[in-house]
């Protein structure tokens, strides 16, 4: 997605999925007559990216030089590429003959049209599932780790050889799923059409090392003008990443949400107390039907989700952002 492109906010307000917790059930939108379509989502491997930049793999190896460290790094890149290619072949072969199929690279997700009957298979690390989640509306997602053990496996928790079984049980509604809560930010009210959605977390702050100045309003009505390094609000999925890192760094006692909890955790980073700014309201929870409201009090603030700074929204003085648990959830096959 090019900077400045935004997802239509109308897509962010779908009826809530059933609260979830790991039990099987019918797949939303599944047609009784139309064969399911399996959409394989993947990203360009590091080797493919290097070849794209250097021309050939041999040229990349030549430019890296003869050193042992360089050779080990390239061997590791080559090994991961081979594992990914193998996993994609296994997943493709697992799709039943009568089913439809599609494939999309991560960089093309914003131009790909998912259908209600789709079963999405993401072949890659956890971050790939976070990337695809914001484009889905209840379609089940199977996370395949092409190189088991190389990542955390929080979302991409299945092996390639499990795909055939998972496709069958997912299509007929027998596969257990988790409805993972997502985070939504709406700018200047629902009617503006401006906002974003993320699986892990949403960040609001300055695009540089300067402080961000804003008015923070909590769900209970308390307010505080702050100058800080930014505000971070995340889901239970995000509570295993950046949100957890912030909590540990500040030795917070805040109980972070679980992945299926309909609530968010939030932190203010490095709030600066001064005669005109406070540092008392720096962490908390946002439960279902609640929100965290932030009004920009400085120019050139940015808003982005899941670390995707290229998809950031630029905020001007006076613009208001409302952050809350999204109605949409990620239906993760577990």
Stretches with model-predicted labels:
Residues 3, 7-13:
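Short, basic, low-complexity termini and linkers enriched in Ser/Thr/Gly/Pro
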Residues 11, 15-18, 22-50:
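N-terminal, charge-rich interaction modules
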Residues 28-44, 61, 71-74, 78-107, ...:
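Catalytic phosphate-donor-binding core of small-molecule kinases
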Residues 45-46, 125-128, 147, 236-240:
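Short glycine-rich anion-binding loops that position phosphate/pyrophosphate groups of nucleotides
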Residues 118-119:
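Structural motif
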Residues 122-123, 233:
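Redox-cofactor binding/interface segments in oxidoreductases and associated redox assembly factors
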Residues 128-137, 243-248:
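Short Gly/Thr/Asp-enriched flexible loops that form oxyanion-binding sites at enzyme active sites
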Residues 135-157:
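Short, acidic/small-residue loops that bind anionic groups at enzyme active sites
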């Amino acid at each position: 997605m090019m900077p400045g492109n935004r997802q239509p906010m109308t897509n962010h307000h779908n009826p809530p999925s059933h609260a979830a917790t790991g039990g099987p059930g019918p797949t939303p939108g599944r047609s009784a007559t139309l064969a399911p379509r399996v959409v394989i989502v993947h990203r360009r491997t590091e080797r493919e990216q290097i070849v794209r930049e250097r021309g050939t793999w041999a040229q990349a190896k030549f430019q890296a030089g003869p050193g042992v460290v360089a050779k080990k790094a390239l061997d590791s890149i080559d090994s991961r590429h081979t594992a990914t290619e193998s996993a994609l072949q296994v997943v493709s072969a697992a799709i039943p003959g009568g089913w439809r199929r599609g494939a999309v690279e991560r960089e093309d997700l914003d131009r790909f049209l998912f259908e209600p009957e789709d079963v999405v298979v993401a072949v890659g690390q956890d971050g790939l599932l976070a990337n695809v989640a914001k484009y889905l509306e209840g379609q089940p997602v199977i996370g395949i780790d092409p190189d088991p053990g190389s990542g955390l496996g929080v979302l991409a928790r299945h092996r390639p050889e499990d795909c055939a079984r998972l496709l069958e049980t997912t299509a007929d509604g027998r596969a257990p799923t988790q409805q993972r809560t997502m985070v939504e930010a709406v700018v200047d009210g629902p009617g503006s059409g401006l906002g974003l959605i993320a699986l892990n977390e949403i960040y609001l702050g300055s695009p540089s090392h300067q402080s961000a100045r804003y008015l923070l309003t909590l769900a209970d009505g308390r307010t505080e003008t702050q100058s800080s390094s930014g505000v971070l609000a995340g889901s239970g999925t995000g509570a295993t990443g950046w949100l957890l890192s912030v909590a540990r760094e500040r030795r917070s006692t805040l109980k972070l949400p679980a992945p299926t909890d309909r609530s968010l955790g939030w932190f203010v980073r490095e709030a600066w107390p001064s005669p005109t700014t406070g540092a008392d309201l720096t962490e908390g929870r946002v439960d279902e039907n609640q929100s965290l409201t932030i009004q920009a009090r400085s120019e050139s603030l940015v808003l982005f989700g899941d670390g995707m700074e290229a998809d950031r929204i630029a905020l001007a003085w006076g613009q208001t952002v409302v952050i809350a648990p999204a109605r949409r959830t990620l239906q993760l096959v577990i």
